[in-house]
A protein has these predicted regions:
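Extracytoplasmic/periplasmic, Sec-exported soluble proteins
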Residues: 121, 154-157
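Mid-to-C-terminal "cap/lid" subdomains and adjacent gly/pro-rich loops that border
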Residues: 1-77, 136, 140, 157-160, ...
């Protein structure tokens, strides 16, 4: 970016700490504002019935480029300038991962295999989202801010190069669902009352019971699930 971005100074840990302290004490300053202030729900292509992409805009350089340590030189390879950018989230991925027991030890961490981007539809959708985001950031409204594209860089143009960049950099946004999915089949963990099959007196009430992802953030649906579960339990107790 040619002009300062609001979050540039907060990449220094001491300044970030002061911003949080100011927010706690005075309810003012950058620490009071969630950085992802702009976003949208979009269709990756015209034939999609309803939005399958969510994008976020952030007024700063992403943390993956590094944190600036106070009073030290910026490490090699870390972007040390103003910037802004965006992220693309696929709302309804077809790829399915798995969680397996590592051993009979109940304290052993499970084996988690996310299996991201394992279907052609997922790769096509993310590629379309990448192109949409790049097009948005190249609009005339950004002209006075535009410097140069730092990530991934203007050399990434072909579909194969875009796919390779996405595969190397894609990550979770921590909205997983479905590990204890609700359903009527034998592979479902809970029934329609969210009771765990084969276990007496146990229910699950969180995002893990969703059979598929909703086309939005998962926090509001999870609150709804909890409220519904409370109603079912109270009705049963009455």
């Amino acid at each position: 970016s040619k002009e300062p971005d609001r979050l540039f100074g907060l990449r220094r840990m001491d300044r970030a700490a002061l911003a949080v302290l100011r927010a706690m004490l005075t309810k003012t300053g950058d620490g009071t504002v969630f950085p992802l202030e702009g976003g949208a729900f979009l269709k990756s292509r015209a034939e999609v019935e309803y939005p399958d992409l969510q994008i976020h805009f952030y007024p700063g350089v992403p943390a993956t480029t590094g944190v600036r340590v106070p009073f030290q030189k910026t490490p090699p390879g870390v972007h040390d300038g103003y910037g802004y950018g965006g992220t693309i989230c696929q709302l309804r991925p077809e790829s399915r991962g798995e969680i397996r027991l590592r051993s009979a030890d109940p304290f052993a961490s499970p084996v988690i295999r996310a299996n991201y981007l394992s279907t052609e539809t997922d790769r096509l959708t993310m590629r379309a989202g990448f192109k949409i985001m790049r097009d948005i950031l190249q609009q005339q409204a950004f002209a006075k801010f535009n410097g140069h594209e730092y990530m991934p860089g203007p050399q990434v143009q072909s579909d194969s190069d875009i796919d390779a960049y996405i595969a190397a950099n894609a990550n979770t946004v921590y909205h997983p669902v479905g590990t204890c999915r609700m359903g009527m089949d034998e592979q479902s963990v809970v029934d329609g009352q969210l009771r765990v099959r084969g276990v007496e007196g146990l229910r699950i009430s969180d995002a893990s019971i969703m059979p598929t992802l909703v086309s939005a953030n998962t926090n509001a649906p999870t609150i709804m699930i909890a409220e519904k579960t409370a109603d079912m339990i109270l009705r049963g107790a009455a």
